[in-house]
Amino acid sequence: GNHEYARTMLLRNATIEQIINACRLVDASSIELSVNNVVGFPDETRDMMFDTIKLNRQFQANSHSCAIFQPYHGTTLHSYCVKKGYFDKDELAEDLTYASPLKQKHITHAEIQGVAKCFALYTKLPENLFDFIKIAEKDDDRGKKMYQELMMLYKTTYAPKAESDVGGGTRI
């Protein structure tokens, strides 16, 4: 969602407008669109994660998933993370992206996990609920209760409804 970061750190040259237009083109067709996002990149701030959320709010997709960055060995970003002291060169990145392995001072693991957990809520629910979604990011009793309530709202309002397919099964 942050063009400058994507261009310099991820070496992606597509503009935000090109991404939005491509997603809208797919949405206008009969092709289902699943958007896979990543948060928790090295030096990424909460504001930059929200640039990605804002980008996702500008087009329709059948699903908006979110993973947490992992510095896989042999990649440019792995070398960058080791050089910055965010990750030990002998450590292996996890295959599952439930937590950030990076040791960064500007953002906590819990904050990255919270944004990733609530990503779909942030992309679909109205902005006037963002303060409640932020509560749902927390892994305490209040946060868990808020998350359950917001997920009920999300599922009843935005989640695709189950429909029968040709084979007689159910697809969601």
Predicted segments with their positions:
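Short glycine/proline- and charge-enriched loop/turn segments
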Residues: 4-5, 83-90, 95
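Bilobed periplasmic-binding protein-like "clamshell/Venus-flytrap" ligand-binding domains
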Residues: 33, 63-67, 124-130
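Radical SAM enzyme core and accessory elements
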Residues: 76, 89-172
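Residue-level signal for pocket-adjacent positions within structured domains
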Residues: 4-5, 64, 72, 97, ...
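Conserved non-cysteine loop/helix-boundary elements of the Radical SAM core domain that shape
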Residues: 1-62, 79-83
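Phosphate/oxyanion-binding loops and surfaces in catalytic or ligand/nucleic-acid-binding neighborhoods
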Residues: 59-62, 71-75, 80-88, 122
